[in-house]
């Protein structure tokens, strides 16, 4: 299935690329999420008339993500209190949603989908370097400190 990308998609292409993808990936992910349209002669012609508009929108999204990364830098370390035992083990865990909520509470909007935890949830008190994928091209590292909280 050939599609025209309407925005940059990681490991696939950039705005305007005509790429061949598996039918399921195209129908179930790219088309419903608005990241691509099917490549027909009419859609290619329509895309060429909208190309500048789409590229400007993509550049604006990237600039916005870079701005959010600078704001997150200004926050410094994010501290999250969690109920923990004497040895530093948490009763429960700190996940992507908790980290996103803590950053949002500090003043910068971050969704849980933007928080990348490749090794799973955090289960011990300590300092962690967490990747935030704010845009396809913008990855930012934030320091998260988990402390034992007597009130949690």
Curated annotation (Swiss-Prot):
Q: Which GO terms describe its molecular function?
A: rRNA binding; structural constituent of ribosome
Q: Which gene is annotated as encoding this protein in its UniProt record?
A: rplI
Output the Pfam families linked to this UniProt entry.
Ribosomal_L9_C, Ribosomal_L9_N
Function according to Swiss-Prot or TrEMBL: Binds to the 23S rRNA.
**Lineage from the top down?**
Bacteria, Pseudomonadati, Pseudomonadota, Gammaproteobacteria, Cellvibrionales
Which keywords describe this protein according to UniProt?
Ribonucleoprotein, Ribosomal protein, RNA-binding, rRNA-binding
For this protein, the parts annotated as crossing the membrane are none
Q: Which family does it belong to?
A: Belongs to the bacterial ribosomal protein bL9 family.
This protein's record includes keyword Transferase:
no
Question: What InterPro entries does the entry give?
Answer: Ribosomal_bL9, Ribosomal_bL9/RNase_H1_N, Ribosomal_bL9_bac/chp, Ribosomal_bL9_C, Ribosomal_bL9_C_sf, Ribosomal_bL9_N, Ribosomal_bL9_N_sf
> In its UniProt entry, what is this protein called?
Large ribosomal subunit protein bL9
User: Known HAMAP family for this protein?
Assistant: Ribosomal_bL9
Question: Which biological process annotations from GO are given for this protein?
Answer: translation
GO cellular component entries: ribonucleoprotein complex; ribosome
């Amino acid at each position: 299935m050939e599609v025209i990308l309407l925005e940059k998609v990681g490991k696939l292409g950039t705005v305007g690329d005509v790429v061949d993808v598996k039918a399921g990936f195209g129908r179930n992910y790219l088309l419903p999420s608005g990241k691509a349209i099917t490549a027909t002669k009419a859609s290619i012609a329509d895309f060429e008339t909208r190309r500048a508009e789409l590229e400007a929108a993509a550049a604006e999204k990237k600039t916005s993500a870079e701005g959010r990364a600078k704001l997150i830098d200004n926050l410094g370390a994010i501290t999250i209190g969690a109920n923990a035992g004497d040895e530093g083990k948490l009763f429960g865990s700190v996940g992507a949603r908790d980290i996103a909520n803590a950053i949002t509470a500090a003043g910068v909007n971050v969704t849980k989908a933007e928080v990348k935890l490749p090794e799973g949830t955090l289960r011990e008190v300590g300092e962690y370097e967490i990747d935030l994928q704010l845009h396809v091209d913008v990855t930012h590292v934030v320091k998260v400190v988990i402390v034992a909280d007597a009130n949690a």
